[in-house]
């Protein structure tokens, strides 16, 4: 059987890092993933997916990723159930991420540092290679049927 998930989306909140009684790191986070199509109003909708990540990957995610970060994850879908305080059975479906990858630099995420502005900037000479190339076929050439070799 195949149970593989690959998602790209933005974190809906900062990852929450906890540890099990056996001191294993476990992180939980939400991922907003845009749908491929637009709705009747022409707007793109998103799915909000609950995810779990374990061990060193969980620690790294909590350390480096914050709400709004664009990440990619690979993992699997998992279902579980438990009984809540009211005695009702609750069913949960979530993605258990095996790996994640940051898809934007820190600068892109809005953590840009200010760049010093150049004080005496010299005007740049025009780049001869950026000039539009002339179309060699633009004018066309008149050819009579007598000029053709066949």
Curated annotation (Swiss-Prot):
Gene for this chain: ssb1
* Organismal lineage: Bacteria, Bacillati, Bacillota, Bacilli, Lactobacillales
Question: Which organism's genome codes for this protein?
Answer: Lactococcus lactis subsp. lactis (strain IL1403)
Composition bias of kind Low complexity appears in 121-138
Checking SUPFAM superfamilies in the record gives: Nucleic acid-binding proteins (SSF50249)
**Keyword Ligase in record:** no
What GO terms are given for molecular function?
single-stranded DNA binding
Q: Which BP terms from GO are recorded?
A: DNA recombination; DNA repair; DNA replication
HAMAP family per the record?
SSB (MF_00984)
Task: Map out region (Disordered) in residue numbers.
Answer: 103-150
* Official protein name in the record: Single-stranded DNA-binding protein 1
Described by its record, this protein's role is as follows:
Plays an important role in DNA replication, recombination and repair. Binds to ssDNA and to an array of partner proteins to recruit them to their sites of action during DNA metabolism.
- Spell out the coiled coil positions from the record: none
Q: Where's the motif Important for interaction with partner proteins? A: 145-150
Any one cellular component term from GO for this entry?
nucleoid
Which Pfam families is this protein grouped with?
Answer: SSB
Q: Where is the composition biased (Polar residues)?
A: 103-120
Q: Which residues form the SSB domain?
A: 1-104
**What InterPro entries does its record include?**
NA-bd_OB-fold, Primosome_PriB/ssb, ssDNA-bd
Entry keyword set: DNA damage, DNA recombination, DNA repair, DNA replication, DNA-binding
Oligomer status and interactors: Homotetramer.
